[in-house]
Amino acid sequence: MAEDRFPGWHGTTILAVRRGGEVVVAGDGQVSLGQTVIKGTARKVRRLSPGGHEVVAGFAGSTADAFTLLERLEKKLEAAPGQLARACVELAKDWRMDKYLRNLEAMLIVTDGETLLVLTGAGDVLEPEHDVTAIGSGGNFALAAARGLMATDLPAEEIARKAMAIAADICVYTNGNLTVERISK
């Protein structure tokens, strides 16, 4: 019953595709509250440059929680410049141990153009097996489409755009207004 009185924020599909020496991270722009679209142009994919080392991050879940995690990730990257995996593991440790952070409801996809990682709400750090990963409400649709498109000769950005379009056609919490960031090592 409480869910009916306080509907949750829904939405977001974030997809990352690694191919040909680059990683493309794409995210849709829809933010929904219950059955209502609140915003269609949110930017859920960001470029970070802590210590001069470029990183692209996409987030799903609570926006405030995601920004908290992005800020902490930037601090971890400043402490370990150029060591994305180490910074993510340190963030995951904090996420699991800190009383406040444990309650954050967000997931991140992060990449430096070489390493591609997913940070889950449980404090896990996962490296995708097939050079493709996705999170959010339409994540499974985008992931399936992108994995199918990996069998083609399409470049990473085109795979990401086509897969996100498929996810937007299927998931009511995902739209076709994309933010796309490319990064290579």
Swiss-Prot record:
Na(+) binds at A168, C171, T174. Its EC number is 3.4.25.2. GO terms for cellular component: HslUV protease complex; proteasome core complex. GO terms for biological process: proteolysis involved in protein catabolic process. It is an enzyme of class 3 (hydrolase). It catalyses: ATP-dependent cleavage of peptide bonds with broad specificity. Keywords: Allosteric enzyme, Cytoplasm, Hydrolase, Metal-binding, Protease, Sodium, Threonine protease. The active site is at T12. Belongs to the peptidase T1B family. HslV subfamily. Protease subunit of a proteasome-like degradation complex believed to be a general protein degrading machinery. This is ATP-dependent protease subunit HslV. It comes from Cereibacter sphaeroides (strain ATCC 17023 / DSM 158 / JCM 6121 / CCUG 31486 / LMG 2827 / NBRC 12203 / NCIMB 8253 / ATH 2.4.1.). The gene is hslV.
